[in-house]
Amino acid sequence: NLFQFAEMIVKMTGKNPLSSYSDYGCYCGWGGKGKPQDATDRCCFVHDCCYEKVKSCKPKLSLYSYSFQNGGIVCGDNHSCKRAVCECDRVAATCFRDNLNTYDKKYHNYPPSQCTGTEQC
């Protein structure tokens, strides 16, 4: 769920998920349109696409089990829905960590009017 995703983000990046990722670029936060603006925004785009694939599992609410091991995240559920949602969140949190070097504050509160073009999942 979103609280577990937030915990993953903190653990993987050291950043506050609300201030750092809730309104970044064209896809980090609610909704999304246009082309992702950088690698971090693309992490959010891929996460949105992943949630779309598992929407019947109610990904924003679904509780799953996971742990942090050797600097990474391990999803623990055998339940297919819970595991799928966990994997969406794990991949995104890891993507944020892997792209910290290109994270750019100019994309905070990015105006939606600048989000043009189209991108397919």
From Swiss-Prot:
Compartments it resides in: Secreted
InterPro entries documented for this protein: PLipase_A2, PLipase_A2_Asp_AS, PLipase_A2_dom, PLipase_A2_dom_sf, PLipase_A2_His_AS
A single GO BP: phospholipid metabolic process
Tissue and organ distribution: Expressed by the venom gland.
Name of this chain's protein: Basic phospholipase A2 RVV-VD
UniProt EC number: 3.1.1.4
GO CC, alphabetical: extracellular region
